[in-house]
């Protein structure tokens, strides 16, 4: 009896010492091993492409174009399963109202409203409405266009959230929204000149604000180094390395010209 108890005690002691030695090492059995094949896709999968949603959005975009052919000019689906609808400026209210109230749409949330300035276009400003449908868990992007002088209809009557968004666009880009209840600047100071997000707005601005010790207040003065337009033709740092320079183009010889002698 005593010998059997001694053997059990000795086995327990050996097991405890083995657990103590292996306490600092991770258990292989508890760690799942993930094996990847050679052809595994290593692209980010934050928002993977969904073929089912892609087909549904494409079908819905075609449906919107059939319902509102007067205003819808182009429909496409982005890589992140977001539908983009390009419309005529006159169709802002009809299209947004349709997308908000239609049973198969229900885009009742205006997530964002912004603008893009492309000076090379005839209608340089692109107005972008980002809508969200909580009912169907889908997004849609409505785009339209305008220029510096042509006003665009305000969307406040459809989405109340467009109020401050349109004020910000007016302040930063100078796009005028007709029938807006309170279209005034929202970010810049009183008496600010110009619209900072336009591509032709000078980087240094027109006015410099500083504190004057003589008059004991903040004064506004014209900027001495003001530039009228942004200059994108800058010197490249790679020009310091002759190896990376492109070889000079050879002169094209006209009929009757002689080839210049090599030096």
UniProtKB/Swiss-Prot annotation:
<dbReference type="InterPro" id="IPR010218">
    <property type="entry name" value="NADH_DH_suC"/>
</dbReference>
<keyword id="KW-1278">Translocase</keyword>
<dbReference type="GO" id="GO:0006120">
    <property type="term" value="P:mitochondrial electron transport, NADH to ubiquinone"/>
</dbReference>
<dbReference type="GO" id="GO:0008137">
    <property type="term" value="F:NADH dehydrogenase (ubiquinone) activity"/>
</dbReference>
<keyword id="KW-0999">Mitochondrion inner membrane</keyword>
<keyword id="KW-0809">Transit peptide</keyword>
<dbReference type="InterPro" id="IPR001268">
    <property type="entry name" value="NADH_UbQ_OxRdtase_30kDa_su"/>
</dbReference>
<keyword id="KW-0249">Electron transport</keyword>
<dbReference type="InterPro" id="IPR037232">
    <property type="entry name" value="NADH_quin_OxRdtase_su_C/D-like"/>
</dbReference>
<dbReference type="GO" id="GO:0032981">
    <property type="term" value="P:mitochondrial respiratory chain complex I assembly"/>
</dbReference>
<comment type="subunit">
    <text>Core subunit of respiratory chain NADH dehydrogenase (Complex I) which is composed of 45 different subunits. Interacts with NDUFAF3. Interacts with RAB5IF. Found in subcomplexes containing subunits NDUFS2, MT-ND1 and NDUFA13.</text>
</comment>
<dbReference type="InterPro" id="IPR020396">
    <property type="entry name" value="NADH_UbQ_OxRdtase_CS"/>
</dbReference>
<dbReference type="GO" id="GO:0005743">
    <property type="term" value="C:mitochondrial inner membrane"/>
</dbReference>
<keyword id="KW-0560">Oxidoreductase</keyword>
<dbReference type="GO" id="GO:0031966">
    <property type="term" value="C:mitochondrial membrane"/>
</dbReference>
<keyword id="KW-0472">Membrane</keyword>
<keyword id="KW-0520">NAD</keyword>
<comment type="similarity">
    <text>Belongs to the complex I 30 kDa subunit family.</text>
</comment>
<comment type="function">
    <text>Core subunit of the mitochondrial membrane respiratory chain NADH dehydrogenase (Complex I) which catalyzes electron transfer from NADH through the respiratory chain, using ubiquinone as an electron acceptor. Essential for the catalytic activity and assembly of complex I.</text>
</comment>
<keyword id="KW-0679">Respiratory chain</keyword>
<keyword id="KW-0830">Ubiquinone</keyword>
<keyword id="KW-0813">Transport</keyword>
<dbReference type="GO" id="GO:0003954">
    <property type="term" value="F:NADH dehydrogenase activity"/>
</dbReference>
<keyword id="KW-0496">Mitochondrion</keyword>
<protein>
    <recommendedName>
        <fullName>NADH dehydrogenase [ubiquinone] iron-sulfur protein 3, mitochondrial</fullName>
        <ecNumber>7.1.1.2</ecNumber>
    </recommendedName>
</protein>
<dbReference type="GO" id="GO:0045271">
    <property type="term" value="C:respiratory chain complex I"/>
</dbReference>
<dbReference type="Pfam" id="PF00329">
    <property type="entry name" value="Complex1_30kDa"/>
</dbReference>
<dbReference type="GO" id="GO:0072593">
    <property type="term" value="P:reactive oxygen species metabolic process"/>
</dbReference>
<feature type="transit peptide" description="Mitochondrion">
    <location>
        <begin position="1"/>
        <end position="35"/>
    </location>
</feature>
């Amino acid at each position: 009896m005593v010998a059997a108890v001694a053997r059990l005690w000795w086995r327990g002691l050996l097991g405890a010492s083995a657990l103590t030695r292996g306490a600092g090492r991770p258990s292989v059995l508890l760690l799942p091993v993930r094996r990847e094949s050679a052809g595994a896709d290593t692209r980010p999968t934050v928002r993977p492409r969904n073929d089912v949603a892609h087909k549904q959005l494409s079908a819905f975009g075609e449906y919107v174009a059939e319902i509102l052919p007067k205003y819808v000019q182009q429909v496409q689906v982005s890589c992140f399963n977001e539908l983009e609808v390009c419309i005529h400026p006159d169709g802002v209210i009809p299209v947004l109202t349709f997308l908000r109230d239609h049973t198969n749409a229900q885009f009742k949330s205006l997530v964002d409203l912004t603008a893009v300035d492309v000076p090379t276009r005839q209608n340089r400003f692109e107005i972008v409405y980002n809508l969200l449908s909580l009912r169907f868990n889908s997004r849609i992007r409505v785009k339209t266009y305008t220029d510096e002088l042509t006003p665009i209809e305000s969307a406040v009557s459809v989405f109340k959230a467009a109020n401050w968004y349109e004020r910000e666009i007016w302040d930063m880009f100078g796009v005028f929204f007709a029938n807006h209840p309170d279209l005034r600047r929202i970010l810049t100071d009183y008496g600010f000149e110009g619209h900072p997000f336009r591509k032709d707005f000078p980087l240094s601005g027109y006015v410099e604000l500083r504190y004057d010790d003589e008059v004991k207040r903040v004064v506004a003065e014209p900027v001495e180094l003001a530039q009228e337009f942004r200059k994108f033709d800058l010197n490249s740092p790679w020009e310091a390395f002759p190896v990376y320079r492109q070889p000079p183009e050879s002169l094209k010889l006209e009929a009757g010209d002689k080839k210049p002698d090599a030096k």
